[in-house]
């Protein structure tokens, strides 16, 4: 009886205890950079659009690339859905890289170029060819890189641009740049809107339900510790409200938010 009782007490006192480790686990750092653009583009055809070229064109990224690159765009009208095509490939085979990060939609694998304002970036690079598959998403057509570059020198600049056009089309952009040898910061705010109610030639009708408006806020900050070490922070916010135009035969009043 005593042996059975002793064995029972031993069994109930034995248990497994799991708990956290008493030491700190050091995780490996993760680097997000666009070094592939520099390291793997020597044999690729690249076109770089500087800030001076960007400022001379319209605000939408579609308009900028249409007149300054070989990219063909399938667009449903001003401010409507716009998708690119490199050398006959589809929009899903074109990667859009924002400061080294692929921003193609996870749902349809493409980017609507009328939801991006070109003046929020100070460097845009168009890279053609199948070598762009290093960015994923089967980008055998090419890649479009939207970059915000840093300038670590004494600088304080303000830029304000206002545009007015037909059919109640308005565009505004303000950019602030502040930098010294250690610190660099850029911030920009853009707003675009239009009633888009143009007349159909040969018909006594106007384009209905084609209005749109969007606002974007972009900022990036960099700090240089020494000649070999820097830290960068990027942020981009976008808010848009867009309707879809109908056709002459059957006008539509549908709306896309």
Question: Where are these predicted regions, by residue range?
Answer:
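Transmembrane beta-barrel outer-membrane domains
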Residues: 25, 77, 137, 165-169, ...
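Extracytoplasmic beta-strand/coil segments of soluble accessory domains associated
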Residues: 62-102
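Short acidic/polar hinge/loop motifs at secondary-structure boundaries
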Residues: 73, 101-129
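Structural signature of outer-membrane beta-barrel domains
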Residues: 37, 91, 103, 149, ...
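Predominantly transmembrane beta-strands of Gram-negative outer membrane beta-barrel pores used
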Residues: 95, 123-127, 131, 143-149, ...
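N-terminal periplasmic "start-of-domain" segments of outer-membrane beta-barrel proteins
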Residues: 24-56, 83, 124
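N-terminal periplasmic accessory domains that precede
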Residues: 61-64, 82-85, 111-117, 126, ...
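Flexible loop and strand-edge segments within Gram-negative outer membrane beta-barrel domains
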Residues: 194-198, 204, 208-214, 224-257
């Amino acid at each position: 009886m005593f042996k059975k009782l002793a064995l029972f007490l031993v069994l109930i006192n034995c248990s497994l205890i799991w708990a956290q480790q008493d030491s700190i686990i050091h995780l490996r750092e993760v680097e997000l950079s666009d070094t592939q653009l520099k390291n793997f583009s020597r044999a690729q055809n690249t076109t770089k659009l500087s800030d001076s070229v960007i400022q001379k064109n319209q605000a939408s990224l579609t308009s900028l690339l249409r007149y300054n690159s070989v990219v063909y765009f399938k667009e449903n009208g001003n401010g409507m859905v716009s998708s690119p095509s490199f050398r006959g490939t589809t929009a899903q085979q074109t990667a859009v890289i924002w400061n080294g990060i692929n921003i193609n939609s996870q749902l349809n694998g493409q980017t609507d170029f009328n939801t991006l304002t070109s003046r929020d970036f100070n460097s845009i690079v168009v890279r053609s060819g199948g070598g762009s598959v290093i960015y994923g998403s089967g980008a055998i057509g090419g890649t479009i890189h939207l970059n915000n570059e840093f300038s670590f020198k004494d600088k304080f600049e303000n830029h304000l641009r206002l545009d007015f056009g037909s059919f109640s089309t308005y565009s505004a952009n303000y950019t602030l740049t502040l930098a010294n040898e250690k610190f660099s910061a850029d911030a920009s705010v853009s707003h675009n809107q239009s009633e888009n109610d143009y007349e159909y030639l040969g018909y006594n009708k106007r384009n209905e339900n084609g209005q749109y408006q969007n606002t974007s806020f972009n900022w990036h900050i960099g700090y240089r510790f020494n000649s070999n070490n820097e830290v960068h922070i990027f942020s981009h916010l976008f808010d848009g409200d867009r309707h879809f135009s109908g056709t002459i035969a059957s006008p539509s009043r549908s709306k896309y938010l």
